[in-house]
Amino acid sequence: MIPYATIEEASIALSRNLTWLETLWFDYSATKSDYYLYCHNILFLFLIFSLVPLPLVFIESSQSTSDLFNRYKIQPKVKNSFSSMFKCYKDVMKMFILVVGPLQLVSYPSIQMIEIRSGLPLPSCMEIVAQLVVYFLVEDYTNYWVHRFFHCKWGYEKFHHIHHEYTAPIGYAAPYAHWAEVLLLGIPTFLGPAIAPGHMITFWLWIALRQIEAIETHSGYDFPWSLTKYIPFYGGAEYHDYHHYVGGQSQSNFASVFTYCDYIYGTDKGYRFQKKLLQQMKEKSKKSNKLVNGGEKFD
């Protein structure tokens, strides 16, 4: 809770006038407890998970749009029915309500312990961006090793096989997993803010962006505007789709966000081999088409 009764008091304490964003934040949060602000994450989680995958649900369910976007689908021969996608949504929401939501409600002491602040001044844009970069890097590295653990025989058979029920993943399948796996993978998500604690707004953004990134990675589509085209070492849907395509025996593409861990530790060799093979086949196909067209033109 902000320890100022009025905007004037806040301005005096900061020795400057509040920015319009700080004024907006003051008006919204001044009378709300830090616990209440922290619990906003539950609402953000439910809304993002429910709404962000909807465009792709529409694309998959509609024949006209499905044909239009089929060239961007990574596994074009696999069609997910509306009923299967809705079942996935219901199963994940059940897990959110019974496991993730209650955990959020009781985990506030950890936020107090690492000193996530909610007062003024607000962090600068550069501070927010720098912290988010740290969070993504820390999450990616630690998630990589947790994910590798889940692909050992015991971890896969006991827990991770549930997540791999979708060999052609969809957005709603991003958090579709055993409840124990969801809890364990929450550690990499929390570790970044624990190492570099910031403002509650930064924490909100982190949870939201991480959820959106996971949904995009499991979308099953590689669009021209996908982030992998613009962010170096970003894996994206095409990269992670290979991991699901190979299935339970996959020892490749473990990283959650970036590709550098798989490259450093040699767990992307199968993926790179497949990419190279597909590229060679594509080039041969082009050459064959040129020869055929050339022959027809010569006649």
UniProtKB/Swiss-Prot annotation:
GO terms for molecular function: C-4 methylsterol oxidase activity; iron ion binding. Residues 132-267 form the Fatty acid hydroxylase domain. The keyword Transmembrane helix applies. It is a multi-pass membrane protein. It is an enzyme of class 1 (oxidoreductase). Acts as a rate-limiting enzyme in the sterol pathway via interaction with ACBP1; sterols serve as lipid modulators for gene expression of homeodomain-leucine zipper IV transcription factors. Together with SMO1-1, involved in the maintenance of sterol composition to balance auxin and cytokinin activities during embryogenesis. This is Methylsterol monooxygenase 1-2. It comes from Arabidopsis thaliana. The lineage of its organism: Eukaryota, Viridiplantae, Streptophyta, Embryophyta, Tracheophyta. The gene is SMO1-2.
